[in-house]
Amino acid sequence: NKMSLALVEISEYVTINGLPWLLLAWVSIYIFRPLATIIHEFGHAIPAVIFTRQTVQIKVGAGQGSLHFSIQSIKIEISLKKMICGYTAFQNVNLSNCQLTLIYATGPIFSLMACTVALSLIYTIKFHIALDALWVGWVCSNLLCLLRNVLPLQLQGPESDAVPSDGLQIIRIMRGRTPTES
């Protein structure tokens, strides 16, 4: 039974010997969270480039970026402050509601794919417990990113302004409003 197998594997962490691995998983959540944000934003940027045929900008973190680079038509700026926040900027003037919905949905889809791939690795390949702990941190980081963006909420923005989550943007589009309208 897979459920009992999962519980047995989890129980390895809830012992005095498992405490270091539990701490490693916890710390890796914070280490991987900026990468989870970048993956999520790439989920938005790829269809935005396809639909707009223009350059798209990804910004991760707050303040002036300390790292600037481009990959094809995607300009990336990364700041080391508040790296759990990010956004993808693109021209949405001539996009249909279907295209906008796809752009907003693909960020969470990329986060979900990152979780799914890591979970499948954890359950199909026998890694050392330290690597399992890192994979658990990776899953949790991407799951937090997914939940933060799917729930229809106003989120704390990188510059202290409230920004709508992807879920809220999609609901606004379905109600016939432009994504930035309340």
Predicted regions and their residues:
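Short, strongly hydrophobic alpha-helical membrane anchors
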Residues: N1-L19
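Hydrophobic alpha-helical segments of integral membrane proteins
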Residues: L7-I10, I39, I46, L80, ...
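Helix-boundary and loop/linker segments of multi-pass membrane transporters
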Residues: V14-L22, A89-N94, A130-L131
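Membrane-embedded alpha-helical segments that form the functional core of polytopic membrane enzymes
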Residues: G18-I38, D132-L147
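Small-residue-rich helix-interface/hinge motifs
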Residues: W26-V93
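Hydrophobic transmembrane alpha-helical segments that form the core helix bundle
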Residues: V93-S182
